[in-house]
A protein has these predicted regions:
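Bacterial Sec-dependent N-terminal signal peptides
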Residues: 1-24
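Start-of-domain marker
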Residues: 20-94, 107
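A cross-kingdom marker for long, charged
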Residues: 25-29, 217-306
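Soluble non-cytosolic domains of exported or imported proteins
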Residues: 43-51, 142-147, 257
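Sec-exported extracytoplasmic/periplasmic mature domains
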Residues: 57-65, 157-161, 271, 275
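Acidic/His-rich structured neighborhood in mature extracellular/periplasmic domains
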Residues: 89-203
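Flexible, glycine-rich surface segments
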Residues: 164-255
Length: 306
């Protein structure tokens, strides 16, 4: 924790670094291609998919995404799952991405979910196992590498926001650059059309109108979870403050993708934290969740006290 906080003080300084930022586990599920006629010719060639998994893992874990030096034990734990639904040519695929990330909680062995997001099942991309994945922020290389880079910067933004107020700003700005470099006329999911895509997920974090969402990450994690072993009542109040942040953000936009992602990831944890809390706090949490994410109210059984 102390090293993470010290990193935040020097994160804008250039330094030579040895280790990369992520410890990401990648899985590629190709079962549909083995059992349907959608598989293109060599759709049953397992080696292609094994190479794809390794290429994605090497790209995420081997790329230097920041100028910050991470020790081995400080690397960010995440997972990237790709379910392949179609293979339309030797190098063209359609699939669905799921990304998850965890964050350690100070002075404990507990890790908390920070990001858990499943995209729509229409991710179209090209992968040629004879060509390495490359990424250049200034020049578009491929949809696959840009998508991976986008989520790496988003995860860095969330991670550092959870340690320092608006600490993830430079990474969100870089993710925005990735979005802007993609040809939206050619690739879907990167422009303002629709509400559940990469453009809007980034807009929710980069637009100052939704700063309460960013503050919620800090209040919930740094002032809440990280302080649980020191002062539980005060830590719970910080988590309530985070929910109030989300409530204010929700009032500005009732369809914020990032806000719903936050609540979906945290709801079971919130239940565990406030189950032993005073009834007044339970009632307060219930009313906030009812306003922010009505679909999750059913998980707060017993919180609506009289």
């Amino acid at each position: 924790m102390r090293r993470i906080l010290s990193i935040l003080l020097i994160m804008f300084c250039f330094c030579v670094s040895q280790g990369q930022e992520f410890r990401c586990n990648v899985s590629v599920n190709y079962q549909k291609l083995m059992t349907t006629t959608q598989a293109y010719e060599s759709g049953g060639d397992k080696k292609v998919f094994e190479n794809m998994k390794q290429a994605l893992e090497d790209f995420i874990n081997g790329t230097k995404w920041t100028n910050i030096e991470f020790e081995q034990q400080e690397k960010i734990e995440c997972s990237f799952s790709l379910i392949l639904n179609q293979r339309t040519s030797a190098t063209d695929f359609v699939g669905q991405i799921t990304i998850q990330m965890k964050r350690p909680v100070y002075n404990s062995t507990y890790t908390t979910g920070l990001f858990n997001y499943m995209e729509q099942p229409n991710f179209q991309f090209a992968y040629n196992e004879s060509m390495p994945l490359e990424f250049d922020l200034n020049n578009f290389s491929s949809l696959l590498s840009s998508t991976l880079a986008y989520y790496c910067y988003v995860m860095l933004g969330m991670y550092f926001d959870s340690y320092s107020l608006y600490g993830g700003q430079p990474f969100y700005e870089t993710a925005q650059q990735v979005v802007q470099a993609v040809d939206v006329a050619k690739y879907s999911g990167w422009d303002s059309k629709g509400g559940r895509n990469r453009y809007w997920f980034m807009e929710n974090h980069i637009n100052s109108a939704y700063s309460d969402l960013r503050e919620a990450y800090y209040n919930y994690h740094r002032l809440g979870l990280d302080m649980m072993t020191k002062d539980q009542p005060k830590a719970r109040q910080a988590i309530i403050a985070a929910l109030q942040n989300l409530q204010r953000a929700h009032k500005r936009s009732t369809s914020m993708l990032s806000l719903q992602q936050f609540v979906d990831v945290k709801i079971q944890e919130i239940v565990s934290i406030f189950t032993p809390a005073p009834d007044q706090e339970k009632k307060q949490v219930y009313e906030l969740i009812k306003d922010i994410s009505p679909i999750n109210v059913v998980k707060l059984k017993g919180f609506n006290t009289k």
